[in-house]
Amino acid sequence: MNLSNLRAPRKANEKKKRVGRGMGSGMGKTSARGHKGQRSRSGSRMMRGFEGGQMPLHRRLPKRGFTNIFRVEYAVVNLDRLAELGLTEITPEVLIKHKLAGKNDKIKVLGNGEIKGAVTVRAHKFSKTAEEKIAKAGGKAEVL
């Protein structure tokens, strides 16, 4: 490949189709819109999803599910992250300080990873495996 044999990609230099510029251009009179009908009119744009009067797909399909307004979101922390802290007592304040949870978050501890040594963990929720692993290491899982 040299500068002397570089070429523009196909259709890169093609001119834009100009419609409505006389019969000789082949795109005069109806300007590629055909005769009559909604699409031939000026300012004609069907709304998104319009299917020619047929019931559109988004209205044919049934609505499903709902949003539970009482759902409680938890900040999830795994045991391996708690082990990295190397503390004997872990509270929500400690997790907020180490940026593992937000100020207003409720905390759920999950059992991914191993914890070494007796650790007291205070959180709003624990998974079964997390509770078992903390107890096995000689620690305590306290629910707030």
Curated annotation (Swiss-Prot):
Species name: Koribacter versatilis (strain Ellin345)
Assembly and oligomerization: Part of the 50S ribosomal subunit.
Claim: RNA-binding is one of the keywords in the record: yes
Region (Disordered) residue spans: 1-58
Function: Binds to the 23S rRNA.
Protein name per Swiss-Prot or TrEMBL: Large ribosomal subunit protein uL15
Superkingdom, taxonomy of origin: Bacteria
Listed Low complexity bias regions: 40-49
GO BP: any one term: translation
Keywords in alphabetical order: Ribonucleoprotein, Ribosomal protein, RNA-binding, rRNA-binding
GO CC annotation terms, alphabetical: cytosolic large ribosomal subunit
InterPro entries: Ribosomal_uL15 (IPR030878), Ribosomal_uL15/eL18 (IPR021131), Ribosomal_uL15/eL18_sf (IPR036227), Ribosomal_uL15_bac-type (IPR005749), Ribosomal_uL15_CS (IPR001196)
Compositionally biased tracts (Basic residues): 8-20
Matching Pfam families: Ribosomal_L27A
Tagged with keyword Ribonucleoprotein: yes
Gene Ontology molecular functions: rRNA binding; structural constituent of ribosome
Similarity field: Belongs to the universal ribosomal protein uL15 family.
